[in-house]
Amino acid sequence: MAQINHVSVNALNLDESVRFYEDLLGVERIPTPNFVGIPVQWLALGRTQLHLFERDIQPTSHHHLGITVDDVEPVYRAAERWDAFD
């Protein structure tokens, strides 16, 4: 059966974005290749990886990432602490 291996996301501030996903979802940092001139960090989220690249964020017509969690309340509170809602 096929499955998604990873999702790549651009981040304006890599360190802050890594801390956000660590706090919000409990992701773990995993070995990350060196991309010359581009700060990057790979994260493990269950069997799927999240690849963060520090780059400018370009507008898109549609984007979102759906994640299943065991208990939505603590995740929602963490997202509020990070001011993650538009």
Residue ranges and their predicted role:
Residues 1, 57-59:
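Short, flexible turn/loop "capping" segments at secondary-structure junctions
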Residues 51-53:
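Conserved beta-strand in the GNAT
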Residues 39-40, 55, 64:
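Short, acidic/polar N-cap/turn motifs at the starts of alpha helices
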Residues 4-6, 62-64:
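Eukaryotic phosphotyrosine signaling hubs
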Residues 14, 65-86:
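Vicinal oxygen chelate
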Residues 34-35, 55-57:
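Short polar/acidic secondary-structure junctions
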Residues 2, 8-49:
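Core segments of cupin and vicinal oxygen chelate
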Residues 10, 55, 68:
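Alpha-helical and His/Cys-centered functional microenvironments
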